[in-house]
């Protein structure tokens, strides 16, 4: 069984027992339970596919926050030839790792 959920403006394929990385979830600590309510699609174990318009109302996905962290640094550089102009800037994006506990179809 798997589901397609929307979190942080992006879509993820999630399965029970798997961990996925999304944009930072503010207000929740590590070990706390979260509910993912923006479910776009679910495929059950017997092959039945449920598609929402845009979201499914009768599906509930429960997960646990594993960690909050920051991704690897992305280096951005500006350069102008022959003018001795070079600027380098780094960025590290915050993320939240969520482990999916169960997918319930009501």
Curated annotation (Swiss-Prot):
Keyword rRNA-binding: yes
GO biological process: translation
An annotated GO cellular component: cytoplasm
Alphabetized Pfam families for the sequence: Ribosomal_L21p (PF00829)
An MF annotation (GO) of this entry: rRNA binding
Entries under SUPFAM superfamilies matching the protein: L21p-like
Keywords noted in UniProt: Ribonucleoprotein, Ribosomal protein, RNA-binding, rRNA-binding
Transmembrane segments: none
Keyword Ion transport among UniProt keywords: no
Subunit comment: Part of the 50S ribosomal subunit. Contacts protein L20.
Function in brief: This protein binds to 23S rRNA in the presence of protein L20.
Family: Belongs to the bacterial ribosomal protein bL21 family.
Protein name: Large ribosomal subunit protein bL21
Top-level taxonomy: Bacteria, Thermotogati, Thermotogota, Thermotogae, Thermotogales
């Amino acid at each position: 069984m798997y589901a397609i959920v929307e979190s942080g403006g992006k879509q993820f394929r999630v399965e029970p027992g798997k961990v996925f990385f999304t944009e930072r979830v503010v207000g929740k600590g590590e070990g706390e339970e979260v509910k993912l309510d923006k479910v776009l699609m679910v495929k059950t174990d017997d092959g039945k596919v449920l598609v929402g318009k845009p979201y499914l109302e009768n599906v509930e996905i429960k997960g646990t926050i594993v960690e909050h962290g920051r991704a690897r640094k992305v280096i951005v550089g500006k350069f102008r030839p022959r003018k001795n102009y070079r600027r380098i800037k780094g960025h590290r994006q915050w993320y939240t790792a969520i482990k999916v506990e169960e997918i319930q179809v009501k």
